[in-house]
């Protein structure tokens, strides 16, 4: 009788799905209120004028306008704002 010995087990073979994080609307782009601008873990980008922040730190537009990125403050923090057109 032909037999094949059982193969060993492996500890590999798992991976998590990518979360599609990052900047979704770039500087100078026109956006509508409610559009998501940045999806992030933690506050890599901070909310500036006319921006809201979700419980998962997602930044979104509160008003229609253009996206503007700035670096401000003594800690050189990155801020995202919406400038009215």
Swiss-Prot record:
Cellular component terms (Gene Ontology): cytosolic large ribosomal subunit
Transmembrane segments annotated in the record for this chain: none
Q: Which GO terms describe its molecular function?
A: structural constituent of ribosome
Xref: InterPro entries = Ribosomal_bL27, Ribosomal_bL27_CS
Q: Where is this region: Disordered?
A: 1-22
Q: Which GO terms describe its biological process?
A: translation
Instruction: State the superkingdom.
Output: Bacteria
Gene3D superfamilies recorded for this chain?
2.40.50.100
PROSITE patterns the UniProt entry points to? RIBOSOMAL_L27
- A Pfam family of this chain: Ribosomal_L27
Q: Which PANTHER family match?
A: LARGE RIBOSOMAL SUBUNIT PROTEIN BL27M, RIBOSOMAL PROTEIN L27
The family line of this record is: Belongs to the bacterial ribosomal protein bL27 family.
Q: Which HAMAP family match?
A: Ribosomal_bL27
Protein name, per record? Large ribosomal subunit protein bL27
